[in-house]
Amino acid sequence: MIIHSLLDTDLYKFTMMQAVLHQHPAAQVDYRFKCRTPGVDLAQFIDEISREIDALCRLRLREDEVDYLRSLRFIKPDFADFLALFHLDRKYLTLAASAAHPGEIELTIRGPWLHTILFEVPLLAIINEVWFRNTSEPDFEEGRSRLREKVRSLRSMPAGCKIADYGTRRRYSRQWHGELLPLLRDGLGEQFVGTSNVFFAKQYGLTPLGTMAHEYLQAFQALGPRLRDSQVAALDSWAREYRGDLGIALSDVVGLDAFLRDFDLYFCKLFDGMRHDSGDPFEWGERVIAHLEAHRVDPRTKVLVFSDGLNIDKVMRLYEHFSPRCRLAFGVGTSLTNDLGPTPLQIVIKMVRCNGQPVAKLSDSPGKSMCEDLGYLRYLRDVFGLPPMPEAGDPARQ
């Protein structure tokens, strides 16, 4: 059994889930799985994946786990009570081998947002671990050696250069994830600020980290009053839920240009900072700093969070570039939790519909966008003033 606890997920799944419970408990959503790594035959392991999903759906939170969530200042009593009764229901999930694309799997989640939001991260962790335990021999000593070198590199930086673990969804295995976190904690001291994984935060006395994911802002494309106002509606909703807590806004759901147009003086003052998850991080940071300064907000009072495909070298370069002009945070994922030699899988589960309407992410990085409805993509780009989609046959179209 790969997943032993419903806490073995990212914190932002719980923080978004709480907002859904309080504000949109009736919302219905669709998610789709996609493997971006070519030539990966996951279909051969579909029975093993299915058994792991069955085990996941039998899990409930233990009393001590619910008590841990209650201890977090932003978790409200009614949500903790709800989680004490919660379990994932297999009826909302379909898994089959793809008839159109041999070797691929078709994984769909469809149902109430409140009851399906916790599927994504453990499903990705399951698929990763099933793949790697069947296709590679783990070289944990090589992984430990690489980890020690990363610790040495980071220790050579100023004490303000700090990282967090964001690697649950693409980890090599649960065992390796559990081993590396205390190594980072003990090796880096205050330069290791915590983990997005709630289970391991509880187990190792680490700070659980996270705010919102793309799906939260995507859903408001169907939940908000107007499509053009969907980002503003999502950020307002978040502010109502958390009243100044968990104040990191995600900037790339419909691209940085559109985000900055919506992130006005009110949001610049209200939120603690912004998170980068696609596009050139150096260009992004410069534009965010300039945006804050244009609104007479001192960037040194705000946090820029970087979380897109980071490794330790990139962390150090970003820190040297932006410090001390702003506060900095770095969430490192695959480079920490899946660096034992085998090539990591590029797999995602993304929301594609909400209340029967298509929703989409228009990433600042080519290839990271995902939507089933090309007509909606064209409309979304037009509404937010983005360049038209490339014509059929243009490599950029893919």
UniProtKB/Swiss-Prot annotation:
BP GO terms, sorted: NAD biosynthetic process via the salvage pathway
Pathway entry: Cofactor biosynthesis; NAD(+) biosynthesis; nicotinate D-ribonucleotide from nicotinate: step 1/1
Xref: InterPro entries: N/Namide_PRibTrfase, NAPRTase_N, Nic_PRibTrfase, Nic_PRibTrfase-Fam, Nicotinate_pribotase-like_C
Keywords: Ligase, Phosphoprotein, Pyridine nucleotide biosynthesis
Gene Ontology CC: one annotated term: cytosol
Sequence positions bearing Phosphohistidine: 214
PTM: Transiently phosphorylated on a His residue during the reaction cycle. Phosphorylation strongly increases the affinity for substrates and increases the rate of nicotinate D-ribonucleotide production. Dephosphorylation regenerates the low-affinity form of the enzyme, leading to product release.
Catalysed conversion reaction: nicotinate + 5-phospho-alpha-D-ribose 1-diphosphate + ATP + H2O = nicotinate beta-D-ribonucleotide + ADP + phosphate + diphosphate
Record EC number: 6.3.4.21
Chain's role: Catalyzes the synthesis of beta-nicotinate D-ribonucleotide from nicotinate and 5-phospho-D-ribose 1-phosphate at the expense of ATP.
Name of the protein: Nicotinate phosphoribosyltransferase
